């Protein structure tokens, strides 16, 4: 797969990044290099490799679920300029 100048401009537009005409060719080269590397990764045979979520084995510690309020409401809103019943008060922005 190859990225052309029009695709670079479209990606920049979607990412809301201003890209000058002089910046398009270097970005095009970089994106093509990245895609070439990804294609190389796709060619690697991983049929005998077991999927994993971490490089190091980890056992998840489980605990009993307990519903609580956390006990931190007052600490959380302590520095807020306006609060009511441990909730933040903010100015109305939509009528």
UniProtKB/Swiss-Prot annotation:
It comes from the Bacteria. Belongs to the GatC family. This is Aspartyl/glutamyl-tRNA(Asn/Gln) amidotransferase subunit C. Its EC number is 6.3.5.-. HAMAP family: GatC. GO terms for molecular function: asparaginyl-tRNA synthase (glutamine-hydrolyzing) activity; ATP binding; glutaminyl-tRNA synthase (glutamine-hydrolyzing) activity. Keywords: ATP-binding, Ligase, Nucleotide-binding, Protein biosynthesis. InterPro entries: Asp/Glu-ADT_sf_sub_c, GatC. Heterotrimer of A, B and C subunits. Allows the formation of correctly charged Asn-tRNA(Asn) or Gln-tRNA(Gln) through the transamidation of misacylated Asp-tRNA(Asn) or Glu-tRNA(Gln) in organisms which lack either or both of asparaginyl-tRNA or glutaminyl-tRNA synthetases. The reaction takes place in the presence of glutamine and ATP through an activated phospho-Asp-tRNA(Asn) or phospho-Glu-tRNA(Gln). One of its GO terms (biological process) is regulation of translational fidelity. It catalyses: L-glutamyl-tRNA(Gln) + L-glutamine + ATP + H2O = L-glutaminyl-tRNA(Gln) + L-glutamate + ADP + phosphate + H(+); L-aspartyl-tRNA(Asn) + L-glutamine + ATP + H2O = L-asparaginyl-tRNA(Asn) + L-glutamate + ADP + phosphate + 2 H(+). Gene3D superfamilies: Glu-tRNAGln amidotransferase C subunit, N-terminal domain.
